Amino acid sequence: MPRSLKKGPFIDLHLLKKIEVAAEKNDRKPVKTWSRRSMILPQMVGLTIAVHNGRQHVPVLVNEDMVGHKLGEFAGTRTYRGHVADKKAKR
């Protein structure tokens, strides 16, 4: 279920502070975060945010289409290696 409009979007305060500082300085360096639950706001457009996927930080370049989504949606946590082929079927 989506979040109530009355409450507004959720974003961790420490991430919001980092983004405001990066926007002021026009810093091109990625902003590292572990907060996958934070929503992407219009202030983040154009910034690169390194989102943690459980193993490493995945760089995500934020564009206008991503506003309203969560950061974790753009950094997958699972590695899909494909289905194993049946050895009997190959013969």
UniProtKB/Swiss-Prot annotation:
Stated family: Belongs to the universal ribosomal protein uS19 family.
Domain of life: Bacteria
Gene behind this protein: rpsS
InterPro entries: Ribosomal_uS19, Ribosomal_uS19_bac-type, Ribosomal_uS19_CS, Ribosomal_uS19_SF
This protein's name: Small ribosomal subunit protein uS19
GO cellular component terms attached to this protein's record: cytoplasm; small ribosomal subunit
Functional note: Protein S19 forms a complex with S13 that binds strongly to the 16S ribosomal RNA.
Keywords: Ribonucleoprotein, Ribosomal protein, RNA-binding, rRNA-binding
GO MF annotation, one: rRNA binding
Gene Ontology terms: biological process: ribosomal small subunit assembly; translation
